[in-house]
Structure formats: C-alpha cells, structure tokens
C-alpha cells in the first residue's frame, strides 16, 4: 500500500534526513562495544534547579564556586560551541570549545538536533548572563532517527499535535505546562478531600448494568462469563453502595466513558471526580465546591482570578475574560435563570413566569414556550413531561450565558432520577449544577434515599428508553436492594476534571487537556 504523503517534497526531504541519521547510528554502533544506546550515565541534576540556585549569581561568583553538574536531556539547538539541552524541567546550555575539548567536539559529528545526551562539567555564566556547563564529559545516550519539526515554525498543525503528542510535548512548552498544571489540579483535589477525612476508593470500570448518569454507554463482552458488559458512564451507584456499607465520606478520581459525540467540550473517555458525604445536603456541597476551587486556584495559580482568552485564527488575543473565584458564587434557580437570561432570546415574549413556576398545571404553555425559543424535539419527546421541557428551555436560552461562577439549583425531578425531592416543592429536587464561562463543570445533589421513590424513577427511565431515548437509565435492582438496607442522608457531586483543567489553563478545547484524545483514523 502506497502512502501518498511520502511522495510530497517535505516527506521526501524527511526520509533523506532519516536515512542520514541511520548511517550515523550504524557508525556509532561500529565504533563501540555496546548497541549505541548506552545506559550508564548518572544524571544528578535538573536544569530548573540549577537555574533557580545559580541564576542570580554573577559570572565571577560562579568561577569562584567551581561547582560541577551532571545533566541529561534532548539537544534542541547547536550554536557553535554551545548545545541547548532540554530536560523535563527546562533548558540549560552545554559548552565545548573545539581547540580545548577536542575529544568531545569530535563526537559532535554524529550529533543531531533531537538526540539525547548526558554532559558533566563546571557551571559558568556567559557574558550575556546565560548559565552553561563547561563540558569535561559528554555521552550520546539516544540517537534520534526522526528530525524534529522546523524550529522556527514549531508544531502548529493541530491534528499532528493530538495524534503525536510526544512531538508536541518536546516542542511546545505551553503544552508541557498544561499537563503539569493538570497534575497539580488533580493532586490539589485529592489533598483537599483527604484532609477532610474522605477516603479514596476504586470501583469497577466494567459493569453489568450502566448507571449513575443519563448517557449512552459503550458495550463489550466478557468471554469467560459469556456476558455482555458496559464501560461505566459514572461511578455513582457503586460509591453510594459504599456509603450504605458505612463509609461516610468517599471519593474516586477516574475515567468514565460515554458513547456520544466529540466536541470542544466532550470526549468519549473523560476523567471525573465524584465524592459523597453522609449527613450532608446539597447546600453543604455547594459550600465545599466554592472552598475547593478557591483553594486549588490559589495553590496552583497563585490567584483566585482566572484569565481566559478568545483568539482569532492567527492566535492573536481578541478578547479577555476574568473569572473571580474569590467572590461568593452566584446561586440561581433554573426558572430564575430562564427569566433573567432568556429575556433577549428569540421567543422571549412567550416566557410566562406564572406557568414556569406552576408547570404541572400549565403543561401546554410550557410546551409552547419550548417551541417558541427553539427547543428541538425528537422521538423520545412524546414521554417528556413539563420538567424535561423546562430543562430544555434553560439549556437553550440561559446555559451558555452563565459566565461568572454560578450554581443553578431547583432541577425538576424528571431530569434528576437520582436526586432527592425538595421538601417544600416535590416538582423540584435538591440539586445543583455549577457553571463557569458557559460550561457545566459540576453536578451535585442531596441523594435520593427512598427506595420506593427510586424504583418508580427507574421505571420511568425504562419507559423513556423504550420510547427511543438511548441515554435513559436502566433499572438497577441491586441498587434498590442496597437502598432498602438504608442509605443515610447523603449528598454527592461529580466534577469534570478535563473541563476544570480547560478553565485553569485557558484551553479552548478539551483535546488540549487530554494527553491522547480520541481521533478518527487517518485516511490512507
């Protein structure tokens, strides 16, 4: 099979460079007893640590200190007697003068940009103020057979960045910083919860019955059991089983899977944190969420004000937005959000506050409002009740306008099959979703612990599935059985890690914060 891409001038030039590098590797192998990839260099220091310790010292101070450092990393540039070496922490220069360090410079004939080397020597500072290691030892540790992208252009092709993330990480410091930030955010969440006596647990990825969210699952087959199974869409039901069992505070940070579309905010495989607390309600969780995000922002970013930007096709910033996590978050009911944000939407004249606040007695008016504002119906709409229509109206007219940190509360029970009904108004539940910049980041509620009510809601979900809604939940008899043993008053929440990282790192698409996002196979 012929790869048409290999016939382009760029591909032909690359193939020539690869061939030249293979020749160099063969020469290296022929001149040494090993295989050309030695593993005997002891790296003792990182570039960033050296820069932090000695960056402010003068040239004269370093010459007096005469400190020796051993570093290793990838060669990113060759400039006369200097090599620019990049390790996991940053960059530093190595120096070898051809008339003094002849033996070392002789080895540079086989050196290419992208090779991995180890160097050792005394630290100095150049006249321009740059630190460098004056080499008395040099080892080629790994020969890079493929050339890195052109240094002046870097790696700008988005497809290549996502498909070959390893190249992106080598070339782009911003990408490396994004994933370092992601690691710190996850660690911050874990530390925040464990310091408050939450226990981290692991629950199954493979499930016989998918549950815990309304979403279409991925299917697989267990050969030994001859059993169809599902990749989990959420860990919720198993985590609440643990609360039934006596673990009052639990959390899990792990992957979930939903067989749905891909967008700038959705990836079929994604990471979330779910946590559950006995003897708490959804108000407690809103308070916890505020404190958690504020704490993590301060620890990771050094500020509670988050800057996000909108860029044009040239990468130039055309708009800045600032989200203040230091102020109390807005709390707004779903109906109030519709009335506040929907007033400028098409069909706004149809929005009837009285009907929205008494939907069960104004179902026809609710449906008329939904049609007026542009809600699209589908094959499952025939089983929608007023609560589902109100939620669709909210998503159409208000959700994308929730810019500053906002909790939306009072979700109808119809769209909240696992949430506890409100004591004063049984049409709504004690549930919230959290939004920043028009993105949903979290979903939490006081848990439904009435086994009979839960069974009825599962049955309604089954009816919706039978009507064509492939995202509706299955009936989970074992979960009902667990509730019948008694779930204490409990509140639980899920936060999308990927979207949270997008917010904290000013990333416009979810693919920028997932190391290896799902992509369509490349055309042959």
UniProtKB/Swiss-Prot annotation:
Pfam families named in the record: tRNA-synt_2, tRNA_anti-codon
Cofactor (UniProt): Mg(2+)
Binding residue positions for Mg(2+) 1: 433, 440
Gene3D superfamilies linked to this entry: Bira Bifunctional Protein, Domain 2 (3.30.930.10), Nucleic acid-binding proteins (2.40.50.140)
GO biological process assignments: lysyl-tRNA aminoacylation
Catalytic activity: tRNA(Lys) + L-lysine + ATP = L-lysyl-tRNA(Lys) + AMP + diphosphate
Keywords: Aminoacyl-tRNA synthetase, ATP-binding, Cytoplasm, Ligase, Magnesium, Metal-binding, Nucleotide-binding, Protein biosynthesis
Domain of life: Bacteria
Residues that bind Mg(2+) 2: 440
Entry EC no(s): 6.1.1.6
Cell location: Cytoplasm
GO cellular component: cytosol
Top EC class of this enzyme: ligase
One example GO MF annotation: tRNA binding
Cofactor: how and how many bound: Binds 3 Mg(2+) ions per subunit.
Family of the protein in this entry: Belongs to the class-II aminoacyl-tRNA synthetase family.
Cited HAMAP family: Lys_tRNA_synth_class2 (MF_00252)
Subunit and interaction comment: Homodimer.
Protein name in UniProt: Lysine--tRNA ligase
Organism: Colwellia psychrerythraea (strain 34H / ATCC BAA-681) (Vibrio psychroerythus)
